[in-house]
Amino acid sequence: MSKELQLTAEESFEEELRALIKEDKSPKPEGWKLSPKAVLTYICGGKAGAKDIVPKYIGNKRLIEICIATLITDRALLLTGEPGTAKSWLSEHLAAAISGDSKKVIQGSAGTTEEQIRYSWNYAMLLSGGPSMEALVKSPVYKAMESGSMVRFEEVTRCLPEVQDALISLLSEKRISVPELGIDMPAIKGFSLIATANTRDRGVNDMSAALKRRFNMVVLPSPKDIETEMSIVNQRVGQLSSRLDTNSALPGERIVRKVITIFRELRNGQTLDNRQKVKSPSGILSTAEAISLLTNSMALAGSFGSGEVSDEDIAAGLQGAVIKNDEKDRQIWSEYLNNVMKLKGSEWRNLYNSCQELLKD
């Protein structure tokens, strides 16, 4: 087992990708490692000969088909949606399946500069020998254009407008000019860009209309029902636990259902049976947070408990997930405990008591 804390998609699922490449008989777009059909199988699950391909995305298959079809054309892809809807996860796996490399990535922030998108210089070499290819520091976009592969741009709306504007010419002209060297580097076939942006947390600046026109936009929804969300959570928690030393068994169906029920009710503003309205806290309570909560509960159970995730283990995680704005969220959580959870019956009694004890501290 690798000692790396987190493997890339192509490393984690290397055997699946090898099996798909071996069995793939469909035509491949130039620069692609797999055909569009094989990419779809990798993302949504299926078979590659005798090898089972686990689904990386559980949801509307048609959305994935649209994503793949977009990347076949010369259009860039923009994945948007609520936080925790697997935008980054999907972009990484699309890049891994199509190019065999998901490591060409720019993390957007208020500090991202145009040089990080185009190129910069090794200033020691620049001062000693002037502009040269050896002194040129290529950005992930430059490397992707040069090799004809996918590049990922995370949280594009967190970048300043002038940085976003630099993308417009790159996506329109599909080339990078380096006037200091008198070269004009065109993108090789196979190049495309996959960007992500949150709809809830819009970041520093919204995208301009000109930049939006350079993308095909796909909105990734939250899981449509509790069973779908439980399936996603169970699969991802299982994958994470296989490389984390939690010393705990996977959380049982009863525990997972409780966590997802609470998250969905608070997130949607009503109980699952639609009979009672509830107030929503300031936090997102996304599927990704549920996965993190359950993984942390496994660590608690393995290190300080019986080795099996209990109501007491998830209670601490629930309070931390719900209460972000101390006063307002604490009141919302208290009302939910007393008006909803308390009335759910004896199966929920232990969790209710554990949550109330923590709320008093």
Task: Provide a role label for each language-model segment.
Residues 74, 101, 128, 218, ...:
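Amphipathic alpha-helical interaction segments
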Residues 302-361:
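C-terminal engagement/docking regions of AAA+ P-loop ATPases
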Residues 237-309:
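Conserved AAA+ ATPase small/helical "lid" subdomain
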Residues 2-245:
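AAA+ P-loop NTPase catalytic core and its hallmark functional loops
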Residues 6-10, 248, 252-255, 259, ...:
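Intrinsic-disorder-associated interaction segments
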Residues 61, 65, 139, 165, ...:
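Non-catalytic, well-ordered alpha-helical scaffold segments
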Residues 170, 262, 316-317:
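Short acidic/histidine-centered micro-motifs embedded in hydrophobic/aromatic stretches
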Residues 214, 232, 296-300, 317:
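A general alpha-helix detector
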